[in-house]
């Protein structure tokens, strides 16, 4: 090909390319590449306690948990438990926060044990209070949206608090809630143990605290009582719920009904699974996550949440 012919060929090729590209500069965006709502991230998470067996065996630490959430389960969340935290030292917590941010993870919850508000022994009560303050600060550093701290119980009474204990619990939760509110998150109790798991007591507590920085983590179907009483409690607590823990039995039972309670109340938090057996944790958690995801995906595509091939078990 002569130089003149080559120049003419190149001019023709460039003109054709420009003509092809020109419409793309003025045409409306191709809506086919916009991510549809059904493909957006689901509000799903897994509670770190689900891997306490691996933790105790030295086979997982906090950083391994973050990797597991992001890359094994393809989550955008990490539901933390202070059993995985070696300390509340700020430098250590900031290292964890850096790893959270590196993976672009959201922390919907930090569950804190050994910081329950009431203990009959005043010395122990103060020790737990200081631990609560340290973990509220941890929640702030880690970017948690909710920090769960239990209320505690009086002696062996699992249904009601004494007047002294109740007044103290309400006072402390209001203090904690104000700190949380000032720093952009919430804190509160969980349907977990003691009077927290007795609906009349938990309802009384939620109404008494009455603070915008206070909320409740609902360990679904964790209430005391008959099945009918538990079902009623799960429905009635929904307006106060800001986080959830969904165990194996719920995932394999009334999952759709229980999640519908929250959906009907306008729940905006995350649906977090929790596993307890300390055995085959990777596989068991995957099963629970799949069941919760299936319900949410059904809702997002106009379904009822119930797989037509597998009716929900009561």
Give the positions of each predicted feature:
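Histidine-acidic metal/acid-base catalytic patches
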Residues: 2-74, 196-314
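Conserved beta-strand positions in the central sheet of alpha/beta enzyme cores
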Residues: 77-79, 109, 148, 245, ...
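Metal-dependent catalytic neighborhoods of phosphoester/phosphodiester hydrolases
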Residues: 88-94, 121-125, 282-285
């Amino acid at each position: 090909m002569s130089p003149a012919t080559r120049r003419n060929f190149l001019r023709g090729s460039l003109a054709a390319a420009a003509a092809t590209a020109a419409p793309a500069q003025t045409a409306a965006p191709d809506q086919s590449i916009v991510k549809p709502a059904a493909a957006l991230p689901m509000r799903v998470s897994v509670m770190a306690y689900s891997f306490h067996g691996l933790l105790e065996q030295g086979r997982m630490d906090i950083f391994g948990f973050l990797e597991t959430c992001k890359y094994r389960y393809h989550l955008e969340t990490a539901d933390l438990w202070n059993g995985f935290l070696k300390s509340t030292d700020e430098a250590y917590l900031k290292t964890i926060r850096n790893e959270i941010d590196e993976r672009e993870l959201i922390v919907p919850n930090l569950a804190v044990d050994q910081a329950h508000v009431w203990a009959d022994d005043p010395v122990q009560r103060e020790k737990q209070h200081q631990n609560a303050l340290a973990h509220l600060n941890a929640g702030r550093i880690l970017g948690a949206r909710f920090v769960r701290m239990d209320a505690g119980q009086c002696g062996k009474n699992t249904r009601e608090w004494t007047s002294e204990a109740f007044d103290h619990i309400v006072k402390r939760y209001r203090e904690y809630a104000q700190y949380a509110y000032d720093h952009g998150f919430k804190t509160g109790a969980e349907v977990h143990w003691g009077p927290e798991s007795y609906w009349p007591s938990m309802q009384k507590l939620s109404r008494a605290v009455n603070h915008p920085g206070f909320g409740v983590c609902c360990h679904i179907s964790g209430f005391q009582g008959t099945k009918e009483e538990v079902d009623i409690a799960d429905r009635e607590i929904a307006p106060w719920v800001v986080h959830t823990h969904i165990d194996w039995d719920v995932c394999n039972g009334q999952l759709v009904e229980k999640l519908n309670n929250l959906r009907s109340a306008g729940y905006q938090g995350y649906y977090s699974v929790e596993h307890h057996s300390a055995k085959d944790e990777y596989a068991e958690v995957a099963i629970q996550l799949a069941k919760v995801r299936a319900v949410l995906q059904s809702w997002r595509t106009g379904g009822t949440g119930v797989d037509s091939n597998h009716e929900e078990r009561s």
